[in-house]
Amino acid sequence: MALSRLMIRDFRNISVADLSLAADFNFLVGANGSGKTSVLEAIYTLGHGRAFRSLQSGRVIRHEQPEFVLHGRIEAGNVDARATSVGLSRNRLGDSTVRIDGSDGHKVAELAQLLPMQLITPEGFTLLNGGPKYRRAFMDWGCFHNEPGFFTAWSNLRRLLKQRNAALRQVSRYQQLRVWDQELIPLANRISEWRADYSAAIAADITATCAQFLPEFRLDFSFQRGWDKESDFGELLERQFERDRALTYTASGPHKADFRIRAEGVPVEDILSRGQLKLLMCALRLAQGEFLTHRNGRRCLYLIDDFASELDTGRRRLLAERLKATHAQVFVSAVSADQIRDIPDEKGKMFKVEQGKISLQSEV
């Protein structure tokens, strides 16, 4: 699976771009502020319905323009398979239109299914040293792409938790919450089981990849479901009713789950250097993408912003070799071509980005 064509209109500082893309490596080279990260963000938005640098739609629409428009052509990688066209537009009011093969009315989740991707940015350390929500997102990405019923269950869980938290401000007895909990409890257990199963299944891939990237450390991974593992979730909700009512939110549940990572028994953020943390982040993203390939034959896109950040020459070369081994489509941004010369025998296309203008510089 690869994007063979990308069209961008009025996104960030890019007025218009129509790019024919390589199935392997695509390099975006330009000075800071030139727009190379905007290209990566356009691809990410096409597959997620939102940007990775801003949650506000208006901030990614080019100045004084009413909307942004993104289009892509997805090649399945099979000679006999038909290509799929996808599109996303959004105006300043936040109204979106998702198009697949020319028809409207589709959902962003359908784009995400068609375009699985892994993002590596200088801000991506939050996966390791940020709050649990970032690691829940890591697990949920895997569950979304491996469990057909996950997205519906996850959406219903969010809705029920929101309703339950609102009800906690109004009720005086637990019995008044049962209408929500009767639906919430089986959903919570199902989602927790999916996350636990996914965490256990991907552990071998993560361990093997981390052994290549950080052989000097013994790394341990553990899934925490968000409530005491010895407790029945339904009984816990009833037992913690007064506490939840005082807090006005549900204090325990799958929305509090975490995926903890330790090095030599210590939280990784307390022992690893910035360069080592980036390698670990890359290892996790690569392992997750490769697990998807092993499980169902689908390949991720890898988006890597500021390739050289935090990495010395040896580590850049190691990352490049592992990316090549995935046989996936990769997009890499760099300030100069010198920063990507560590990718051995690189094949693909190099684009020059300057003040929002994108031009093909070379093709190997």
Curated annotation (Swiss-Prot):
Binding-site list for ATP: 30-37
GO cellular component: cytoplasm
MF terms (GO), sorted A to Z: ATP binding; single-stranded DNA binding
Keywords: ATP-binding, Cytoplasm, DNA damage, DNA repair, DNA replication, DNA-binding, Nucleotide-binding, SOS response
InterPro entries named among the record's database cross-references: DNA-binding_RecF, DNA-binding_RecF_CS, P-loop_NTPase, RecF/RecN/SMC_N, RecF_2
Chief location of this protein within or outside the cell: cytoplasm
Gene Ontology biological process terms from the UniProt entry: DNA replication; DNA synthesis involved in DNA repair; double-strand break repair; SOS response
Location in or out of the cell: Cytoplasm
Function: The RecF protein is involved in DNA metabolism; it is required for DNA replication and normal SOS inducibility. RecF binds preferentially to single-stranded, linear DNA. It also seems to bind ATP.
PANTHER family cross-referenced by the UniProt entry: DNA REPLICATION AND REPAIR PROTEIN RECF
Family the UniProt entry places it in: Belongs to the RecF family.
Name of the molecule in the record: DNA replication and repair protein RecF
Organism the protein comes from: Sodalis glossinidius
